[in-house]
């Protein structure tokens, strides 16, 4: 962080992108300013945004690879230049773009001799490769080579303990961090009591999203963190009132669906195959469910009202939105018999 004195004017608080460029397929750069801020505010915003950008943005990555009959990750495979460990490291570097939730399967199946690159990965429709030229392995002999892959969307850095995987399946330390780096600097302007600050924010991403998209998502995540306090103020309840308040259940999926075998929706599609991103929920409700690892309609129906009300930022109006959505996917007559508001 750098502080400098510059001349400037005090206008209504606003932000804008002052520089944007694409250095390569896997390196995007953006520079933004927010001004004017009172003394100390630039630090508050800069620190919060930097942490949110580096740790709260979701990314898609390869989380597991399965080789046939490979005793350990340091093994070598006849006809392949790289060891299994080197192949795993190359797979870890593959940059993917998607809106998927949960785990999806992918694969590589080629015949040598040839170079294997990211474009050889057979992906589900919802996933795309940012840079198809990323190397994976070099087949030096005419052999058939197949790998089964698992792809997931997550945030941060996920590690898994290595075990003796007899089936040739190996976890990859997944790096779901589309933002590579964030810097911010603060510039002071004005004199005396008219002194203000300008926040400069620099963002580098891996190409799976633009710096502007990353900044928007980080800002939304920060806003969601403070929504409970805003709602408490709007409702006008004191701490003691809120502590002792009982929330009547507006909906009870698990209890009221007891003894009801709802494994499929009205169209006969299994509920575990209907993902919440297909339900057209409001973004706030959708984000609440996503953060609680509720990815499918079956996940949603397995929750009680107590489970849902414990989700951060989840409110009564979210329950009403979910009810409206359920009417589209479940038998209405059965729902009316089991669920009431």
From Swiss-Prot:
Record protein name field:
DNA-directed RNA polymerase subunit alpha
In the UniProt record, does the keyword Transcription occur? Answer: yes
**EC number(s)?**
2.7.7.6
Annotated Gene Ontology cellular components are:
chloroplast; DNA-directed RNA polymerase complex; mitochondrion
Lineage, please?
Answer: Eukaryota, Viridiplantae, Streptophyta, Embryophyta, Tracheophyta
Can you quote the domain comment? The N-terminal domain is essential for RNAP assembly and basal transcription, whereas the C-terminal domain is involved in interaction with transcriptional regulators and with upstream promoter elements.
Any single GO molecular-function term of the entry would be:
DNA binding
**Native species of this protein?**
Lolium perenne (Perennial ryegrass)
Family label: Belongs to the RNA polymerase alpha chain family.
What Gene Ontology terms for biological process does this UniProt record contain? DNA-templated transcription
* Annotated gene: rpoA
């Amino acid at each position: 962080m750098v502080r400098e004195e510059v001349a400037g004017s005090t206008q209504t608080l606003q932000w804008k992108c002052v520089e944007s460029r694409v250095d390569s397929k896997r390196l995007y750069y953006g520079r933004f300013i927010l001004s004017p801020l009172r003394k100390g505010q630039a630090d508050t915003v800069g620190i919060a945004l930097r942490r949110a950008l580096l740790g709260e943005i979701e990314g898609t990555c390869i989380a597991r690879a399965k080789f046939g009959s490979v005793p350990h990750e340091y093994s070598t495979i006849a006809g392949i230049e790289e060891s299994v460990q080197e192949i795993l490291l190359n797979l870890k570097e593959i940059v993917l773009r998607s809106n998927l939730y949960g785990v999806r399967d992918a694969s590589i199946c080629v015949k040598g001799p040839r170079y294997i690159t990211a474009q050889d990965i057979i992906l589900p429709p919802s996933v795309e490769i940012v840079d198809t030229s990323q190397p994976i392995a070099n087949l030096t002999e005419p052999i058939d080579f197949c790998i089964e892959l698992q792809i997931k969307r997550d945030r941060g850095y996920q590690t898994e303990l290595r075990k003796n995987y007899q089936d040739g399946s190996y976890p990859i330390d997944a790096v779901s961090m589309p933002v590579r780096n964030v810097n911010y600097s603060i510039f002071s302007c004005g004199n005396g009591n008219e002194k203000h600050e300008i926040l400069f924010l620099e963002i580098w991403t891996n190409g799976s999203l633009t710096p502007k998209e990353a900044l928007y998502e980080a800002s939304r995540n920060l806003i969601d963190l403070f929504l409970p306090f805003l709602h408490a103020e709007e409702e006008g309840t004191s701490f003691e009132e809120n502590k002792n308040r009982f929330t009547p259940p507006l909906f009870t999926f698990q209890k009221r669906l007891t003894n009801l075998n709802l494994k499929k929706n009205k169209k006969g599609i299994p509920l575990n195959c209907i993902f919440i991103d297909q339900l057209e929920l409001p973004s706030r409700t959708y984000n609440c469910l996503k953060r609680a690892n509720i990815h499918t309609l079956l996940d949603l129906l397995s929750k009680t009202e107590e489970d849902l009300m414990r989700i951060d930022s989840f409110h009564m109006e979210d329950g009403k939105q979910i009810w409206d959505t359920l009417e589209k996917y479940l038998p209405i007559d059965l729902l009316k018999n089991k669920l009431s508001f």
